[in-house]
Amino acid sequence: MNFKVVLAAAALLATQSFAIIGIGGHYAPGFGTKMKAGEIAPVADGIQFGHGGFDGTMQGFGIKLWIDLLPIFDIEATYNIQFGSYDAALYVDGVAEPLPLEIELAGTPFGKANPKFVASGLDVSITYPLTFIPVIRPYIGGGVTYHLNTFVLNQSFVQGIIDDPAISDMIKSAANKEGLDPEALQQKAQELETLGQTLKQKVQDKAMDEGLKTSIGGHALVGVRAKLPIIPIAAYCNFKYYFGGDYPKEVDAGNMTLEVGGGFAL
């Protein structure tokens, strides 16, 4: 009799520990991605351009929905967004200091700062639980990934922005600050602000024309999810390795992402 009670209690505990559906958010850094620096090269008469790169961890975050309705397999849908910052500057002939480019793109969660390469992806995964132990659920799986990547602020992109002679003249005028008195420097600061707004709009217009670079790939994953009985909160950790997908030529994708987070589970 006691043995039957133990079995019934264990079954109840397992049922309450595994949620049918859950939604959560997570920290999602990407590892191993590199962006090569671009050599300084002419983009207009008397103006050159160069950009830096990055090597290491791309910061990121994401959201996840999981469904445990199927008897053997579970389903996850995940959207991650990651970004890496790099330097970019214009070099005007006869001017000692470069003119840094600070880009503020509408529709991205970043303010005015160094340019950023932003990579995002929508994953649809099927996972297989390795055990059915109550409270904790390790699993393996894989699925399809829809990649969306932004442009890199490279030579050809900048060339398309400042091909207007009026823009080139604004850049040359705003960059030259040598030998100016305080009043003239204040005027230059106003010119730089106007130039920044003009370049911002130019970048946004060209970015809208180019759009996001999209492609299809896949991924494999290993992870674990934990949920206490009764309490409608779960924690999870996934490691994903991606394959396929197209990136700008300057970017060497590391293809590895860690997801650590939690959410509501019913």
Residue ranges and their predicted role:
Residues 1-20, 170-196:
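Cleavable N-terminal export/targeting peptides
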Residues 18-70, 265:
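Short glycine/proline- and aromatic-enriched beta-strand/turn motifs that initiate or cap beta-hairpins
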Residues 29, 64-164, 229-231, 266:
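Gram-negative (and chloroplast) outer-membrane scaffold detector with strong preference
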Residues 35-39, 87-95, 150-160, 201-210, ...:
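Outer-membrane beta-barrel and related beta-rich outer-membrane complex signature
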Residues 45, 55-61, 116-122, 136, ...:
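Residues that define the transmembrane beta-barrel architecture of outer-membrane proteins
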